[in-house]
Amino acid sequence: HGSSFWSDAHSYEAMADDLAKVIAAHGGQADVVGHSMGGKAAMVLALAHGAAIRRLLVGDIAPVAYQHDQSPNIKAMKSLNLSAIRNRAEADAALAQSLADESLRAFLLQSLDFKTTPISWRINLEALEGSMPGIVGWPDISGQFEGPVLFLSGGASHYVQTESRLKIRTYFP
């Protein structure tokens, strides 16, 4: 995450178009695996550029809009004084002032680049924050992907609910 170019366009359609270009540059067809935001991007890729995908695996996400909002997490990340942080423990302590969930902090801190001076975020927080409604949403897209697809989710998943399965079958019969 975060090693690719940054763009202010952070929609699933833009991500799918980027993926299609990468796949075309590497031979024209790929087996695609996507989880969470990557899963939504992979689903849009399959629907908009189906010929680019040989097989699709989507982990713990459905082609639906969700009601949660990650903006408070982004706000907490942006609030860190990165020039004063020297290591992950200090970053965690600073982030703990805004976010109590230790596992969430550990996940978010994976996106800190400790090799830069000062430490920096590998991800474009401004683009994510500005695109949040689209990120938690689902684009107005039609069509179906007829290739092989596997959706994986745990029994206690908060992201693939029973009512989501009908929507999955609509796009991925």
Predicted regions and their residues:
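Active-site loop signature of alpha/beta-hydrolase-fold enzymes
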Residues: 1, 40, 64, 159
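Active-site loop/oxyanion-hole signature of alpha/beta-hydrolase fold enzymes
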Residues: 1-33
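Conserved catalytic-core motifs of eukaryotic protein kinase domains, centered on the activation segment
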Residues: 3-9, 67-70, 162-163
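Gly/Ala-rich beta-loop-alpha elbow adjacent to hydrolase catalytic centers
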Residues: 34, 38, 42
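Flexible "cap/lid" loop of the alpha/beta hydrolase fold
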Residues: 43-48, 52-88
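Conserved alpha/beta-hydrolase catalytic His-Asp/Glu region
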Residues: 68, 83-135, 139
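Conserved serine/cysteine hydrolase catalytic core
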Residues: 116-172
